[in-house]
Amino acid sequence: MAYLKIVLVALMLVLGVSAMRLSDQEDQDVSVVKRAACKCDDDGPDIRSATLTGTVDFWNCNEGWEKCTAVYTAVASCCRKKKG
């Protein structure tokens, strides 16, 4: 009987901790994809002194964004928001 009480208390603790974790995760925006910066063609000739104005996007650029490099890759593109 004592083992049953211990198991039930342990299960309640696990459920309580998992319920607290779910509420913490709701506050985080998981729909935002983490992206890396990249160098557009007009950022300058040297990668060390260039301001990286582009953003790496998988496959093609999203709507409202344009490809800013002349280099073609099958997996990712360097994109930035359209001007104007």
Swiss-Prot record:
What this protein is called in its record is: Delta-stichotoxin-Shd3a
The record ties this protein, via SUPFAM superfamilies, to: Defensin-like
| Residue ranges of the propeptide | 20-33
Write the record's keywords in alphabetical order, separated by commas. Answer: Amidation, Cleavage on pair of basic residues, Disulfide bond, Ion channel impairing toxin, Nematocyst, Neurotoxin, Secreted, Signal, Toxin, Voltage-gated sodium channel impairing toxin
GO molecular-function terms, A-Z = sodium channel regulator activity; toxin activity
UniProt modified residues of type Lysine amide: K83
* Annotated source species: Stichodactyla haddoni (Saddle carpet anemone)
Stored Pfam families: Toxin_4 (PF00706)
Q: Which Cys-Cys disulfides exist here?
A: C38-C78, C40-C68, C61-C79
Q: What does this protein do?
A: Binds specifically to voltage-gated sodium channels (Nav), thereby delaying their inactivation during signal transduction.
Q: Where in the cell is it found?
A: Secreted; Nematocyst
InterPro entries this protein is in? Myo_ane_neurotoxin_sf
Spell out the family assignment given in the record's similarity comment. Belongs to the sea anemone sodium channel inhibitory toxin family. Type II subfamily.
Provide one Gene Ontology cellular component: extracellular region
Q: Where is the signal peptide?
A: 1-19
